[in-house]
Amino acid sequence: MRIVFVGTPEFAAEILEHLIKNGFNVVGVVTQPDKPRGRGRKVAPTPVKAVAEKHEVPFIQPESINKKEALEFLRSVRPDVIIVASYGKILGEKVLSLPRLGCYNIHPSLLPKYRGASPIQRVLENGEERTGVTIYKMVKELDAGPIALQKEISVDPFETFDQLEKRLIELSKEMLIEFLEKLKTGNIELKEQDHSRATYAPMIKKEDLIVDFSKDAESVKNKIRAYDSRPGARAFLGNVEVKLFGVTAIDSSGDEPGLINYIDREGAWIGTGDGKVKVRYIQFPGKKKMTFWEAKNGRLIIEGMRFERRYES
């Protein structure tokens, strides 16, 4: 079975690496163009490109997978199936109709819930207790195709984005191998999604990152862990925008929203609308992430200071 893999970030790269190491015939890769990354804004290859180069798999990086040059590449490698994981761009009908077995997407949510670009973050932000991975046959509509395989896992109360993403990558690897073995033998049963139950996970905007400490402690906890460690939840100390990481506890005893009540080696207790949360790490502009205790000892922060919310979603 000839496979073309389409993806961009680390989530997709780990799945591609797993496919190749398990002996599957990956005949081509499509990933997004290289972009400036990190503090120095140096142009770096996408994680998927790095895997393709490592294993000498032919790859392209088109601005659009739907343009003539990309379609010619896809036709030239003659895929039986196209596997998509976190590509970040829409596949048009010409691409979807190209492989004889179809195009299948690996989506890290329990579809039809959380269709869209940011399912892991939205699951955490909304305090969901369960999530999972869905492999579905792609259609023109976003994340709306019939389901080939779906498995679920529980979400731990203080689990961060990084931690949950790692578990979902491992689940995706296992599921993709199972799916491809079934596809080889024609043993795939597709189940239509219940579109009436669809919810959406839109792309993250900068205002989504801002913590509103006037909300309840559970909501504040969920906001911070949803963006831990990247790109980091934001709050303001005076005119300074900082990032917050590592919520370790919540408490129902009241305090003023945003007020830094107490700092010890384990973190800072910060007031919310109905209690307080304990946050371990803070990052100031141009500095590395540090504990609140380190920030206090460095005279960057003291008890009695207050976090604010500066722009509205």
Curated annotation (Swiss-Prot):
GO molecular function terms listed in the Swiss-Prot or TrEMBL record: methionyl-tRNA formyltransferase activity
Instruction: Cite the EC number.
Output: 2.1.2.9
Asked if the Swiss-Prot or TrEMBL record annotates the protein with the keyword Heme, the reply is no
* A cellular-component GO term for this protein: cytosol
Keywords, alphabetical: Protein biosynthesis, Transferase
Matching entries from InterPro entries are given as: Fmt (IPR005794), Formyl_trans_C (IPR005793), Formyl_transf_N (IPR002376), Formyl_transf_N_sf (IPR036477), Formyl_transferase-like_C_sf (IPR011034), GART_AS (IPR001555), Met-tRNA-FMT_C (IPR044135), Met-tRNA-FMT_N (IPR041711)
Which GO annotations describe the biological process of this protein?
A: conversion of methionyl-tRNA to N-formyl-methionyl-tRNA
Return the HAMAP family for the record. Answer: Formyl_trans
Q: What is this protein called?
A: Methionyl-tRNA formyltransferase
